[in-house]
Amino acid sequence: MAVRAQFENSNEVGVFSTLTNSYALVAVGASENFYSVFEAELQDVIPICRTTIAGTRIIGRLTAGNRKGLLVPTTTSDQELQHLRNSLPDDVRIQRIEERLSALGNVIVCNDHTALIHPDLERETEEIIADVLGVEVFRQTIADNVLVGSYMALSNQGGLVHPKTSIQDQDELSSLLQVPLVAGSVNRGSNVIGGGMVVNDWMAVTGLDTTAPELSVIESVFRLGEGAAPGQINSSLKDTMVESFY
């Protein structure tokens, strides 16, 4: 299921929200409509937490997370951290990171198995990412951009990358991540994929300007049209994991 939404007249959905397979974060704000888009799809499935990070609403650009964990910048207040701990499932690890490149959502893109990170992140940060999120970590660029989190959206099913990513780079990234990748855009031609959409294994939210062709590319690469629902995804994933293991 791919749906379109706006946060207070902004199409940059990925700036104001974070979506994983075990929780969603949505910025505090007057945009009740934006929150209700998440609520309609996720209400009985995973918790949706309304929050600020470091007193700001650009939570999608400041945080990075997956099913197992959530990374927040060191500027996150104690109250915000406590609110996240109270709202998210107990088995999700929440960790503050002391990192110069503190917009973590711009410099990290991950699913439940792999993370791509900005080439200049601290070695210590890389270790924390691997530990808290339980992923393999690779230092990469996307179409020669170091902001991997801004120019890519990734789930366990597939990934959408910057439209100028070469075929060779797509193949290399695809073999690292072990998921199919497509070069494309969101919000009527925007190449800032990470800022323009959020996705998990059964749902994507994109900006209201996203065109029908863009939406169909998103639905096909992330496999969202195949009767996707949380329960079915897990069983099909388990089957493929078992097959690839043997």
From Swiss-Prot:
GO CC aspect terms: cytosol; nucleolus; nucleus; preribosome, large subunit precursor
One annotated GO molecular function: translation initiation factor activity
Description of post-translational modifications: Phosphorylation at Ser-174 and Ser-175 promotes nuclear export.
Main localization, broad class: cytoplasm
Pfam families named among the record's database cross-references: eIF-6 (PF01912)
Keywords (A to Z) from UniProt: Cytoplasm, Initiation factor, Nucleus, Phosphoprotein, Protein biosynthesis, Ribosome biogenesis
Subunit structure: Monomer. Associates with the 60S ribosomal subunit.
Family: Belongs to the eIF-6 family.
Full protein name: Eukaryotic translation initiation factor 6
Organism: Neurospora crassa (strain ATCC 24698 / 74-OR23-1A / CBS 708.71 / DSM 1257 / FGSC 987)
Gene behind the chain: tif-6
